[in-house]
A protein has these predicted regions:
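Active-site cofactor/cluster-binding pocket
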Residues: 1-158
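A short, hydrophobic C-terminal helix/tail in secreted or cell-surface proteins
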Residues: 159-164
């Protein structure tokens, strides 16, 4: 079975790192995975997203027109990617920065205050890691243990200790 993900936010929110951690977690679970980043010329503040396709069999293409799960950390990303979520799919949004609107009735919505949770942990820099925890709870396709292993292998120990 093939499952498609889009992770999106603005530059500086750690979207590409979150995507890398998620893709690595899938690889550690023995699944086939592709990861494709997309970002503008801006270093911070511009739109950033990555697409991940995970499957038990070989992945045919990374770029899909529709997605099963969209994880969005800001309003611009919500507005941009909501139409890419296929009927029956799920959009998971950071309610700290995204209005809790439901413009479509054929998809599921999950709003979680990811930014607020990160701030309660001491720094907004871990919003991306909080978002992966929410994603793991919602889609149940990747275990939290493998996400933690994925985080350890792609982050510095200090950032890992802060995040987890």
């Amino acid at each position: 079975m093939e499952t498609n993900f889009i992770l999106a936010g603005f530059g500086g929110q750690g979207i590409l790192l979150a995507g890398t951690v998620l893709a690595n977690a899938f690889m550690l679970e023995g699944k086939n995975v592709t990861w494709y980043p997309c970002y503008g010329a801006e270093m911070r503040g511009g739109t950033v997203n990555c697409e991940i396709v995970v499957s038990d069999t070989e992945v045919s293409s990374v770029h899909k027109q529709d997605t099963d799960y969209a994880l969005v950390l800001n309003q611009q990303s919500f507005d941009r990617f909501i139409e890419r979520v296929k009927s029956g799919g799920t959009i998971i949004a950071n309610s700290t920065l995204v209005k809790e609107a439901r413009p479509r009735d054929d998809i599921k919505y999950v709003f979680a205050p990811m930014g607020e949770i990160a701030n309660e942990l001491g720094t907004s820099k871990v919003t991306n890691v909080v978002s992966l925890g929410v994603l793991a709870s919602v889609c149940e396709i990747v275990s939290r243990d493998y996400l933690a292993l994925g985080a350890v292998s792609y982050t510095h120990l200090r950032a890992h200790e802060t995040s987890l």
